[in-house]
Amino acid sequence: MKPRILVLGDVMIDHYLFGKCDRISPEAPVQVVDVQKEELVLGGAGNVVNNLLAFGAEVGIISVVGEDANGIWLEQRFQEKGVQTYLLKENRPTTKKSRIIASNQQIVRVDREEKKEIESLTQQKILNVFDRVIKEYDLVLLSDYDKGVLTKEVTQTVIQRSSVPVFVDPKNDFEKYRGATLIKPNKKEASKAVGFLIKNEEDLKRAGWKLKKELDLQSLIVTLSEEGMAIFEEEMMRIPTVAKEVYDVTGAGDTVLAALGYAVAKGKNLKEAAVFANLAAGVVVGKVGAATATLEEIEEYERSIRKAPTEEFIKDFEEIELISKDLHKRGKRIVFTNGCFDILHLGHVKYLQKAKELGDVLIVGVNSDASVKRLKGDDRPINPQFDRAYLLASLEAVDYVVIFEEDTPYELIKIVKPDILVKGGDYKGKEVVGSDIAKEVRLIDFVEGKSTTAIVERMRSC
């Protein structure tokens, strides 16, 4: 069954003039663009609608337009696309943003708009429509471009009256989003809301928890451009970016909001929804203009970025020292774990996936063959060290693998200086090697019944 999603917010027209630019005007020192193509598309909250339609959702839109030709165009366009359309009219210009683009580069943007709040009577009409139709929808998306539709009165009333989750793409006054299910500011917006600049991981944590608590939010997602996203629920979780090429970030925030709403309405949890949204954004920033991504494009994109097994991710001590220094310099959170990983199994994979979720980069130390033999006996390892390292390096969760000769990874940990040191749940109450170096030690429970020793014993009994 298709999810049914209601969008409220500022609709506008995105107007594109595509052309060629290879000369300077004789009238003034400015570029001349020879227009070759012109497009009008749904923008603002309308672009959120476009993205939802591309995913396959059933969509409704509540907004305000002017009593002008652009308002008529928007209404007709929504209706042509099969959108349940509730557009109220006021004596104000319909927002239109014109972008002139040459050689895939935006030269200039011209805005025609009115930013003042909509009239009190119009606000009441919006709420009347909302009360009448909300029972038909699974989720509400508020797309705020600060053009006057989502006033504090409208926003707060919608949040309080909604019987379904309300997700918000915020702008400026965050207080009006109090009590929302989720808001998704970018780093700049979040910094402005908390009153301090987010410069590193600690700033990000402080800002995220502050916003979540003070605004009484169920969840919060801070989008971090090329650094991915940070999810704040019961714990903070990082989702790395997946964009390969960035041509135009126009509308990427709309895509993320739409993708989050669509995935949650389809029954996904927030982490799964964020991964889906990240992939969708990776598709659209590779296009020009306020683009959309279909489910087929997202699936194809996901396949294209899957990590291929390669020895390039297997490093020696010297290489990992340089890499670690660079990662620390860039403020990345390094997670480190280690083990023999003799026969890679489900328990290992799930353990490593959970470890990766704790930071930005996962480095895995692997015992050498000689080290395994000393620890496990003369009949081990089953698989030689390079094979074990290669298999680990092929996992999506693992960023780097280092083989160490010692019985413990202490010397390697001294080089890496991880932010988080991860060991299995069986280390509860035991001293963890390297705990004096890492900033934090985390224990992750293994999958019950999954162990290399058990597999080896079953093999021997055959």
Swiss-Prot record:
Does the record's keyword annotation contain Nucleotide-binding? yes
Picking any one GO biological process from the record gives:
ADP-L-glycero-beta-D-manno-heptose biosynthetic process
Region (Cytidylyltransferase), start-end ranges: 336-462
Its GO CC terms are: cytosol
- Signal peptide per UniProt: none
Which keywords does UniProt give here?
ATP-binding, Carbohydrate metabolism, Kinase, Multifunctional enzyme, Nucleotide-binding, Nucleotidyltransferase, Transferase
Where are the catalytic residues?
Answer: 254
- Report the enzyme's class at the first EC level: transferase
InterPro entries noted in UniProt: Bifunc_HldE, Cyt_trans-like, PfkB_dom, RfaE_dom_I, RfaE_dom_II, Ribokinase-like, Rossmann-like_a/b/a_fold
EC number of the protein: 2.7.1.167, 2.7.7.70
The segment annotated Ribokinase runs over 1-309
Offer one Pfam family short name for this entry: CTP_transf_like
Catalytic reactions on record: D-glycero-beta-D-manno-heptose 7-phosphate + ATP = D-glycero-beta-D-manno-heptose 1,7-bisphosphate + ADP + H(+); D-glycero-beta-D-manno-heptose 1-phosphate + ATP + H(+) = ADP-D-glycero-beta-D-manno-heptose + diphosphate
Sites binding ATP sit at 186-189
Q: How does it assemble?
A: Homodimer.
Similarity field: In the N-terminal section; belongs to the carbohydrate kinase PfkB family. In the C-terminal section; belongs to the cytidylyltransferase family.
This chain belongs to the protein called Bifunctional protein HldE
Name the gene that codes for it.
hldE
